[in-house]
Structures are given as C-alpha cells and as structure tokens.
C-alpha cells in the first residue's frame, strides 16, 4: 500500500486489486460491468457476500477460484508499481490570467483528469478537444450559463450544482467559467 498525497493521481489498470484511500479521492475510469469488493470488513462493518459475487456469471456464482482469476496478479504485485503508475501533477502553462490547470490523471489512451483553478473574480474560457464531466470541488460561480457550486452539506435527494457534462462540440467551442467569489478559488 502507498500513502496518498493530496493532488496526486494514480493509474490503476483493470484487474489490479486495490482499495479506496482514507481521504476523498476521484477515480476516473471507463465503463465496466465488473465490480468485485473483496474486503469483508470495512471500518468495522461486515460487507454482504453479494458485493463479492454480484458481477459473477450465473455459472460461476460462489466459485472462489473464478473470483481470484479476475485479478491480474502480475500487475498487482509488481515491485515498481508506484514508479510505473503514480501520476504526479503536471502543471500546464498559463494561457489566461486567473486560470491554473494541471493534469492529475494521464498517460493512458482512455481517460484523463485535469484540475482547473479559477482565481477569485476571474472569468476564463475553458476549451478542450473531447467531451468531459466537470466536478466542482471548491468555490462557486458560473459554468457556462449555469450557476455552479461545490456542495457543503448535501442530503439524499437534494439538487446540487457541482456536476456538468460538456459535449465534444461545446468543449471545442469553449465554456466560459466565472468565479464570482472575492476570496475563494473555484476548483473544478
């Protein structure tokens, strides 16, 4: 196990056994119909067996050998795992006043994640070559025509303004993002 450093990303290939960090992290990934939770106790709570077997085909239900065959043991136990898969933040050159961008997940052909910081009072235009999901993790302002805000206390069923999907065409045109705070950065 490796300590998680805030702001640092990891690339975890499919089949590599791993666990969530003890701090809030984001794990960008592509769609998959496989999810096997092999941890039987989490923070003192016993996980039900169905979390282990739900994604097994009917003919393999309860087959422990089939469960363990899902794991890529060679990648999961490689001695240079950290060196190969850690993703230190890569700051991008400043292109607009009040905008700081850095890659936090990269170096694979399927997914990437960028942290975008808009300074207090700044208005910037974000352009990209592909569609993306934007998550507001700190601050408030405008994301295109919408109000955006990192949630403080969010209860089940509440509406929030922290998640946006940007189509490829909109990403290429650019989205205007404004931080309406006088004090706090807007971090997406």
Which role fits each region the language model picked out?
Residues 3-21, 30, 137, 146-181:
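Conserved metal-binding segment of the jelly-roll/cupin
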Residues 21-47, 176-188:
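A short hydrophobic beta-strand segment most commonly corresponding to one strand
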Residues 36-131:
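C-terminal amphipathic alpha-helical segment
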